[in-house]
Design a protein with these regions (language model features):
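Core segments of transmembrane alpha-helices
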Residues: 52-64, 115-116
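Interfacial loop-to-transmembrane junctions
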Residues: 90-117
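Transmembrane alpha-helical segments that form the membrane-embedded catalytic/substrate-channel core
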Residues: 12-29, 85-94
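Cytosolic, membrane-interface loops and tails of multi-pass inner-membrane proteins
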Residues: 22-48
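Alpha-helical transmembrane segments
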Residues: 3-19, 68
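Physicochemical signature of membrane-embedded alpha-helices that form the seven-helix bundle of GPCRs
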Residues: 9-12, 80-83, 107-110, 114
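Juxtamembrane boundary at the C-terminal end of a transmembrane helix
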Residues: 120-130
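Mid-chain, well-packed structural core segment of small domains
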Residues: 60-61, 67-97
Length: 130
């Protein structure tokens, strides 16, 4: 069984993670910081954005894969995953603390709602109620 939605979203996650890493690397290079944050607030914010992404994204992808494997994905699953990914980009930008700071809140809420919603669906699928 080809998990088209899961594969597409995993590819998107890899690109976003790469982008978040590049953003950290840009600050490291410009400030000549090799290890740690060097007390640089922007680097700390960007590192937290990437770490937050890698803390949450595996759960979302596992839930999506499980739902898709169970044959319960349907047309709704890809847009939910895409919304999550957009929220994570907004969070990454918002973590810089600039005019885009609202993106952090948007990304946080999107992440929480996506995880909770997918977890509920997974339980419904697992118990045969969906």
């Amino acid at each position: 069984m080809l998990l088209t939605t899961t594969l597409s979203l995993t590819a998107a996650a890899a690109v976003i993670n790469f982008w978040l890493a590049i953003r950290c690397g840009q600050v490291r290079a410009s400030q000549k910081i090799s290890i740690g944050t060097g007390g640089n607030d922007l680097l700390e914010r960007r590192m937290r954005a990437q770490l937050n992404f890698v803390e949450n994204t595996p759960w979302v992808l596992l839930l999506i894969a499980g739902i898709e494997l169970a044959g319960k994905g349907g047309a709704w699953l890809a847009p939910v995953g895409a919304t999550y990914m957009i929220g994570r980009v907004a969070h990454g930008l918002g973590m810089d603390g600039t005019a885009l700071e609202k993106g952090r809140s948007i990304g946080t809420v999107t992440t929480m709602l996506t995880q909770l919603g997918l977890a509920v669906v997974a339980v419904l699928v697992a118990t045969g109620r969906m």
